Design a protein with these regions (language model features):
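Residues forming the flavin
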Residues: 1-245, 251, 255-264, 268-302
Length: 303
C-alpha cells in the first residue's frame, strides 16, 4: 500500500515496523523456494521496496509505544525505535496494521471450527484439501481461509468450485483431473512464498496485549484494563467478557478486537489462545447501509 500511495502522489512521514525481529537465518532458508516458485511476486515486492527507498521514506524497526496525539484530531505520532529513542512525527493520518490474518468471522458464525496457527499467530478455519470446512457444504477460499495473495485465492476458489461441481453430480473427479492438477499445482506455487512473508512480517504477540489505558474496542470505547478486570470475573471466557464489556458489539462486530481480546484473556489467566478461541460473532459481518437492507425484496433474502 505504501508504494501505491507514493505512486499516486501521496507522501508518507514514516513506516513503523512493529513486528518481531527478523530471523535472517530463516529468511535465507525460505527465500530460495520463494524465488524458484514465485519469481514474479518476489520481483514485484522488490520493485515496491525500491519505490519506498528512492522516495526517501524513513523506516523504523522494532517500534514500540506508538501513541496518536492531537486535540480533536490526529496531529502527531510518537513512538520508540529499536534503540530506545523516542520520536515525535507530525502526521494527519495513522494507519495501523498488525499481522496478516484471515477473515474467519463468517465461518465462525456458521459453526465452523477454527485452529490456532502458532507460526502465523492467527486463527484459521479447519479445511480439507478442497477448502470444505467442518460444516458440510460450506467452502472457504481466498483470504477467508489463509492470506496467500491474489493468485492463491484464485486457485483455491477454483478448487472449491470443482469440488462443488462433483458433489452436485455435474462432473466426476476423473473428468476434472487435469483441471484439478493444474489448480493444485498453481496454488502450491503461490503459497510457497508465504513462509518468507511470515518470516519478514511475524506478528509480535505482546503487541496484542498492551497497557491498560490502550483502547482495544474502538467501537464501544473499551480499553485493555477494562477487559483484564472483566477477565477476573466469572469464567473469563471470550463470550462472557464480551457480554460484560460490550467488546465486539459495535459496527465492526469484532473484526478488529476479537483476537486482541483473546490474547488479553490468555495472558491474564496464563492459558493458551488456542484453548480460549474467539467470541461468537453475529451478522452482518460488515456495516450494512439502511438502503441495502431495504433493497432485499424477498423474505428469503432477509433470512
Amino acid at each position: 500500500y505504501a508504494a501505491q500511495l507514493l505512486t499516486a502522489g501521496g507522501s508518507i512521514a514514516g513506516i513503523l515496523q512493529t513486528g518481531a525481529p527478523v530471523s535472517w537465518v530463516r529468511v535465507l532458508q525460505t527465500l530460495p523456494e520463494a524465488i524458484w516458485q514465485c519469481p514474479g511476486q518476489i520481483a514485484k515486492g522488490l520493485v515496491r521496496l525500491a519505490k519506498i527507498h528512492f522516495c526517501h521514506v524513513r523506516t523504523f524497526r522494532d517500534v514500540k509505544k506508538i501513541e496518536a496525539r492531537g486535540s480533536g484530531k490526529l496531529e502527531a505520532v510518537s513512538f520508540t525505535d529499536h534503540k530506545g529513542i523516542t520520536h515525535h512525527v507530525d502526521a494527519a493520518v495513522l494507519m495501523v496494521h498488525e499481522g496478516l490474518i484471515p477473515g474467519v468471522h463468517p465461518v465462525l458464525a456458521a459453526g465452523g471450527r477454527l485452529e490456532w496457527d502458532e507460526t502465523e499467530m492467527c486463527f484459521r478455519p479447519i479445511l480439507d484439501e478442497w477448502g470444505e470446512s467442518t460444516v458440510p457444504g460450506l467452502f472457504v477460499a481466498g483470504d477467508a481461509a489463509r492470506i496467500g495473495g491474489a493468485d492463491a485465492a484464485l486457485h483455491s476458489g477454483a478448487l472449491a468450485a470443482l469440488r462443488i461441481a462433483m458433489q452436485i453430480g455435474h462432473a466426476d473427479e476423473k473428468a476434472l483431473a487435469t483441471k484439478i492438477h493444474f489448480h493444485r499445482k498453481k496454488f502450491r506455487q503461490a503459497m510457497s512464498v508465504r513462509p518468507l512473508v511470515t518470516t519478514l512480517s511475524r506478528l509480535r504477540l505482546e503487541q496484542l496485549s498492551p497497557a491498560d489505558d490502550v483502547m482495544i474496542c474502538r467501537c464501544e470505547s473499551v480499553n485493555a484494563g477494562t477487559i483484564r478486570r472483566a477477565a477476573l470475573t466469572g469464567s473469563g471466557m471470550p463470550d462472557q467478557v464480551k457480554a460484560f464489556t460490550r467488546t465486539g458489539m459495535g459496527a465492526c462486530q469484532g473484526r478488529q478486537c476479537s483476537l486482541p481480546l483473546s490474547v488479553l484473556l490468555a495472558s491474564t489467566h496464563n492459558r493458551s489462545v488456542a484453548e480460549l478461541g474467539l467470541f461468537r460473532v453475529r451478522a452482518p459481518f460488515k456495516p450494512l447501509k439502511l438502503g441495502e437492507l431495504a433493497s432485499l425484496s424477498h423474505e428469503s433474502d432477509i433470512q
